[in-house]
Amino acid sequence: MAAAVPKRMRGPAQAKLLPGSAIQALVGLARPLVLALLLVSAALSSVVSRTDSPSPTVLNSHISTPNVNALTHENQTKPSISQISTTLPPTTSTKKSGGASVVPHPSPTPLSQEEADNNEDPSIEEEDLLMLNSSPSTAKDTLDNGDYGEPDYDWTTGPRDDDESDDTLEENRGYMEIEQSVKSFKMPSSNIEEEDSHFFFHLIIFAFCIAVVYITYHNKRKIFLLVQSRKWRDGLCSKTVEYHRLDQNVNEAMPSLKITNDYIF
């Protein structure tokens, strides 16, 4: 029974300890998250401040070398603060009253000029720099052909140039004439082609006529026999004496042939 009682007591104690340990674990995780958020916010604020603040170095990087030289020359001409002397010569009063000497007071003009120079608006300086950048450089105006000071090239053509141009034109004309002559040899004109075609056509006709005459001359008898008609041949033969004799002999030998007009020679 005594052992069972402590076990029962340990159960509620462990149940109470579990939520406490979970809370401690959450707190331990929350601390690094909070630190990370603080670091990120600090980095963002620094970046924003850098972007908002104007950078005079960037402006100075865009300034060209002639403009920088001009600015340095102007700065050299201006008297520096150390060169301005605030001491003035002692003023001697002509009227001495009771042996009291008048104490000289320095004029406030140099100090006022220095304060005015120090109190100038930086935007005015930026505008001056932009104006210097936009204005053309004096060095480019003085030297047209580079820093070496070379003389300007004379673009006017002289008589030698004219002669050279004439020679080149003549050479080009000669080349063109040679090319045209070569083309005329290689490619005949259309007139020559037409004459050649007509010549071949006439030659073919003449050869055909010669062939016809040659054939008719060598086969004139055959052609004559083919052209002759039967009646025309009978008319020519009936007038001869030999034909009458032959006809009589045939009729006597074969009287049946009188009925027909066919004769066998």
Swiss-Prot record:
Gene Ontology CC: one annotated term:
membrane
Phosphoserine found at: S229, S256
| Key word Transferase present | no
The membrane-spanning stretches of this chain are: 197-217
Kindly list the cysteine pairs connected by disulfide bridges.
Answer: none
What positions belong to coiled-coil segments? none
Q: Where in the cell is it found?
A: Membrane
Skewed-composition ranges (Acidic residues) = 114-123
Q: What is its main location?
A: membrane
Q: Which InterPro entries match?
A: KCT2
Q: Where is the composition biased (Low complexity)?
A: 79-97
Could you confirm whether the keyword Transmembrane helix appears in this record? yes
Instruction: Could you list this entry's UniProt keywords, alphabetically sorted.
Output: Glycoprotein, Membrane, Phosphoprotein, Signal, Transmembrane, Transmembrane helix
Q: Where on this protein are sugars attached?
A: N75
Q: Matching Pfam families, A to Z? A: KCT2 (PF17818)
What is the protein name for this chain?
Keratinocyte-associated transmembrane protein 2
Q: Which organism is it from?
A: Homo sapiens
Print the organism lineage. Eukaryota, Metazoa, Chordata, Craniata, Vertebrata
